[in-house]
Amino acid sequence: MSGIALSRLAQERKAWRKDHPFGFVAVPTKNPDGTMNLMNWECAIPGKKGTPWEGGLFKLRMLFKDDYPSSPPKCKFEPPLFHPNVYPSGTVCLSILEEDKDWRPAITINQLFIGIQELLNEPNIQEPAQAEAYTIYCQNRVEYEKRFRAQAKKFCPS
């Protein structure tokens, strides 16, 4: 593992614990020996207030490569979401998560979460990742909103 990646992730964790957006969760996983694994985080993003996603808490895994922050983390909803910019595998399709597009090493975990939360409510129809969600979003917005309201209810924290 890269010392640069681990150092940056330790800084990110410290900053996150000190100050993060209300309702968001980001916790490094544990290795089998009980030590913290900074390369694999279990996260959750709340649905934005005043949107059909409100009330939902959407679980996301962030996986960091050894060359982080030169390369972005992989962000994957678990379980996958019905959304035009979420691949059927759960992987998020967002330009700031793509090395050859808008990723910059200065982007923080906090900024990634805000970007993903915005994407939930405002899909980018220029970059669809899921055909069914994209088609319904474009052709029948009422049905689309009904489906993701149901999804938000399904992912309500207990």
Swiss-Prot record:
Native species: Mesocricetus auratus (Golden hamster)
Cross-link (Glycyl lysine isopeptide (Lys-Gly) (interchain with G-Cter in ubiquitin)): K18
GO cellular component, one term: cytoplasm
Lineage top rank: taxon: Eukaryota
CDD domains: UBCc_UBE2I
Keyword list, A-Z: Acetylation, ATP-binding, Cell cycle, Cell division, Chromosome partition, Cytoplasm, Isopeptide bond, Mitosis, Nucleotide-binding, Nucleus, Phosphoprotein, Transferase, Ubl conjugation, Ubl conjugation pathway
GO BP terms in the entry: cell division; chromosome segregation; positive regulation of protein sumoylation; protein sumoylation
Family of the protein in this entry: Belongs to the ubiquitin-conjugating enzyme family.
Enzyme Commission number(s): 2.3.2.-
Quaternary structure and interacting proteins, as annotated: Forms a complex with SENP6 and UBE2I in response to UV irradiation. Forms a tight complex with RANGAP1 and RANBP2. Identified in a complex with SUMO2 and UBE2I, where one ZNF451 interacts with one UBE2I and two SUMO2 chains, one bound to the UBE2I active site and the other to another region of the same UBE2I molecule. Interacts with SETX. Interacts with HIPK1 and HIPK2. Interacts with PPM1J. Interacts with RASD2. Interacts with TCF3. Interacts with NR2C1; the interaction promotes its sumoylation. Interacts with SIAH1. Interacts with PARP.
Keyword ATP-binding among UniProt keywords: yes
Catalytic residue positions: C93
Xref: Gene3D superfamilies: Ubiquitin Conjugating Enzyme
N-acetylserine, modified sites: S2
Function: Accepts the ubiquitin-like proteins SUMO1, SUMO2 and SUMO3 from the UBLE1A-UBLE1B E1 complex and catalyzes their covalent attachment to other proteins with the help of an E3 ligase such as RANBP2, CBX4 and ZNF451. Can catalyze the formation of poly-SUMO chains. Essential for nuclear architecture and chromosome segregation. Necessary for sumoylation of FOXL2 and KAT5. Sumoylates p53/TP53 at 'Lys-386'. Mediates sumoylation of ERCC6 which is essential for its transcription-coupled nucleotide excision repair activity.
Protein name: SUMO-conjugating enzyme UBC9
